[in-house]
From Swiss-Prot:
Gene3D superfamilies: 1.10.10.410, GatB domain, N-terminal subdomain. It comes from Streptococcus equi subsp. zooepidemicus (strain H70). GO terms for molecular function: asparaginyl-tRNA synthase (glutamine-hydrolyzing) activity; ATP binding; glutaminyl-tRNA synthase (glutamine-hydrolyzing) activity. This is Aspartyl/glutamyl-tRNA(Asn/Gln) amidotransferase subunit B. GO terms for biological process: glutaminyl-tRNAGln biosynthesis via transamidation; translation. Pfam families: GatB_N (PF02934), GatB_Yqey (PF02637).
Amino acid sequence: MNFETIIGLEVHVELNTNSKIFSPSSAHFGEDPNASTNVIDWSFPGVLPVMNKGVIDAGIKAALALNMSIHQHMHFDRKNYFYPDNPKAYQISQFDEPIGYNGWIDITLEDGSTKKIRIERAHLEEDAGKNTHGTDGYSYVDLNRQGVPLIEIVSEADMRSPEEAYAYLTALKEIIQYTGISDVKMEEGSMRVDANISLRPYGQEAFGTKTELKNLNSFSNVRKGLEFEVERQAKILRSGGVIRQETRRYDEASKGTILMRVKEGAADYRYFPEPDLPLFEIDDAWIEDMRAELPRFPAERRASYIKDLGLSAYDAGQLTATKALSDFFEQAVALGGDAKQVSNWLQGEVAQFLNAEGKTIDQLALTPDSLVEMIAIIADGTISSKIAKKVFVHLAKHGGSARAYVEKAGLVQISDPAVLIPIIHQVFADNEAAVADFKSGKRNADKAFTGFLMKATKGQANPQVAQQLLAQELQKLLD
C-alpha cells in the first residue's frame, strides 16, 4: 500500500525589537545569563505588562508579507501551563484572534513549478526562558529570553513531501528576512521549527494520526527528520501497526527520530483573555503605514531580473538570497553596471570573500559604485581580470575608488607596445635556452614566453596585446 504524506509546519520567529514585548529589558541575543531581565520578566507580584508598539508593527508587516487578513480588533490571551522557565505559570499569547489569518505564499518546486501553501494564522506571543541542565546535578534557569517577542506562523497541512517543506521554509525565511522584522538565524534561536507529519492511504480524505517533530535546528535537519518519519510510519502501517500521537526529536548522530513523549490528547491550556492588556485597535492608516515600509519581495525581484535584465533563473535566485545582496545588486545596476558582470562578481569573488571572512555583504567596505567602477576599468583595459581580483580584495577591506587605488598602487595594465617590446627582448635575453628550443622547432616553447613576460611585468601586461607582440617578436627570431 502506498501512502500520501501530509505535513504542516509551525515556525517561531523572534522579532528584532530593541526591548521585549511587555518589558523594557533588552531583547538582544548573547547577554550573560539573566542580565537582560527585570521585575516584569521575573513576574514579581503586582507588576503589569506594557505593550511594545514595535511588536505590533512587526506583526502587521509579517501578516501583509504573507498575504494574510489582519484582525483589526486584536487582543491577547493567557495560555496557562507550569514550567520552570515560565515564572508566571502562563504565557501571554493570542488564541482566537491572532494578528494575521488566512494567508499564503508560493513555493518553487524542484521541477521549477510553483505551489501555493496556505497559512492558517500568525500570532504574537512572548518567548519563554531557557533551562540548562548542568553536569553538577543542578538545573539552571536563564530568563534573558523570557518576554522576547515572537510571531508564530502556522501553516495549513498543505505540504506533501519533505522537499516541499524545505522549499516552504526557504521561501518563508526569505520573506521574513526581507521585511526586516527578524534576522531569522536558526543558530541563535531566532527561527525555530516544529513539524507535524502524518500518512494516509492515497484517496483517503481523513488525516492520519500525526507525529510532532522537535529539535530541528536547520532546514536540512527538518528535511532529514521528515524523510525518516515517512519511512518509519509507512513501515508501521504496512505491518498492520498503529501510529501513536507522539512528540519525537531529531537526533543528528543516528540520523533518525527519538521518542520524547506520547500525547494522550490535546493539551488544555485554559486560554482566556489577558486581563492586564487592553483591546488593540489596528486601523487602516496603521496598516497602510506598515505596508509603505515593506520592500519588493524576492519573487517579484527574481521575475524582474529574468525579464528585464536577462539573467537566468539560477542567477536571479542567488542574487535574491538576502535583501542586502539584492539591494547591492540593484544599486550597482542603477549606477550603470552591466547586470551580468555585476552578477558574476557577486556570485564569484564577492561570495568567496564573504565565506572566507564570515561576513555579510553589508559588512564590506566595498560599495556598489566602487564595484561598478572596477568592472569599467577592466572593460577599458586599464587592469586585467587577474589584477582586478587583487583590487577587489583591497576595496572589500578598505573601500575607496577602484581607479584611484589602481593608479596609486601602480597596477595599471601595460598595453603600450613601446613599453612591452623592450621587455620582451629582455625576456629573450634572460631565457636563451627557451629561445634555442623555439628556434630548433619546439613550437610549444613559445607558451613559456607568456609566463616569462607576465612574471617580468608582475602580471601587468595586457594579455591580448602581449600575445600579439610575442607572436610578432618570436616570428622575427625565425626570419
